[in-house]
Amino acid sequence: MADVEDGEETCALASHSGSSGSKSGGDKMFSLKKWNAVAMWSWDVECDTCAICRVQVMDACLRCQAENKQEDCVVVWGECNHSFHNCCMSLWVKQNNRCPLCQQDWVVQRIGK
C-alpha cells in the first residue's frame, strides 16, 4: 500500500468527557502528518505449513531446497482442504493413503503453486 502524504490531514477528536465546558469549534487536538497503511493477506487454507516437512507450503520443501529444485516444488490440496508439498505428500501416500492432519482418505483436489 502507498503512504498517504497529502499535506496535513487533520483529525479532530470529540471529547469523551461529555462535559459542557469542552472545547468546540476549530481547535485541533492533533494533526496527522503521515500514515502507513498495513494489510494482511490470508489464504483459503486452514494451515500454511506442510505438516510433513514443517516448511511453509509456498516455499520449497527441504528435499527440493537441498537438491536445488525449488521451481519444481508445487503445492497439492486435498479434498479436506489441507495443503502439502506435492513431493512430501507423494512419499507419504506410499505408506499411508490418508491426510496426515485429519486422517481422511487422501483425494487430490488440485495441484499448483
Curated annotation (Swiss-Prot):
Zinc finger motifs (RING-type), residue ranges: 61-103
Record bears the keyword Ribosomal protein: no
Binding-site residues for Zn(2+) 2, renumbered to this chain: 80, 82, 99, 102
UniProt-listed GO biological process terms: endoplasmic reticulum unfolded protein response; post-translational protein modification; proteasome-mediated ubiquitin-dependent protein catabolic process; protein K11-linked ubiquitination; protein neddylation; protein ubiquitination; reelin-mediated signaling pathway; regulation of neuron migration
Binding-site positions, Zn(2+) 1: 50, 53, 85, 88
Catalytically driven reaction(s): S-ubiquitinyl-[E2 ubiquitin-conjugating enzyme]-L-cysteine + [acceptor protein]-L-lysine = [E2 ubiquitin-conjugating enzyme]-L-cysteine + N(6)-ubiquitinyl-[acceptor protein]-L-lysine; S-[NEDD8-protein]-yl-[E2 NEDD8-conjugating enzyme]-L-cysteine + [cullin]-L-lysine = [E2 NEDD8-conjugating enzyme]-L-cysteine + N(6)-[NEDD8-protein]-yl-[cullin]-L-lysine
Enzyme class: transferase
Result when mutating residue 10 to A: Abolished phosphorylation by CK2, leading to increased protein stability. Does not affect its subcellular location of E3 ubiquitin-protein ligase activity
Residues reported to bind Zn(2+) 3: 61, 64, 73, 87
EC number: 2.3.2.27, 2.3.2.32
Phosphothreonine PTM sites in chain numbering: 10
InterPro entries per record: RING-box_E3_Ubiquitin_Ligase, Znf_RING, Znf_RING/FYVE/PHD, Znf_RING_H2
Keyword terms: Acetylation, Cytoplasm, Metal-binding, Nucleus, Phosphoprotein, Transferase, Ubl conjugation pathway, Zinc, Zinc-finger
Subcellular location field: Cytoplasm; Nucleus
Pathways involved: Protein modification; protein ubiquitination; Protein modification; protein neddylation
Keyword tRNA processing appears in the UniProt entry: no
Domain remarks in the Swiss-Prot or TrEMBL record: The RING-type zinc finger domain is essential for ubiquitin ligase activity. It coordinates an additional third zinc ion.
Subunit structure: Catalytic component of multiple cullin-5-RING E3 ubiquitin-protein ligase complexes (ECS complexes, also named CRL5 complexes) composed of CUL5, Elongin BC (ELOB and ELOC), RNF7/RBX2 and a variable SOCS box domain-containing protein as substrate-specific recognition component. Also interacts (with lower preference) with CUL1, CUL2, CUL3, CUL4A and CUL4B; additional evidence is however required to confirm this result in vivo. Interacts with UBE2F. Interacts with CSNK2B, the interaction is not affected by phosphorylation by CK2.
Function: Catalytic component of multiple cullin-5-RING E3 ubiquitin-protein ligase complexes (ECS complexes), which mediate the ubiquitination and subsequent proteasomal degradation of target proteins. It is thereby involved in various biological processes, such as cell cycle progression, signal transduction and transcription. The functional specificity of the E3 ubiquitin-protein ligase ECS complexes depend on the variable SOCS box-containing substrate recognition component. (Microbial infection) Following infection by HIV-1 virus, catalytic component of a cullin-5-RING E3 ubiquitin-protein ligase complex (ECS complex) hijacked by the HIV-1 Vif protein, which catalyzes ubiquitination and degradation of APOBEC3F and APOBEC3G.
UniProt family annotation: Belongs to the RING-box family.
Protein name, per record: RING-box protein 2
Source organism (scientific name): Homo sapiens
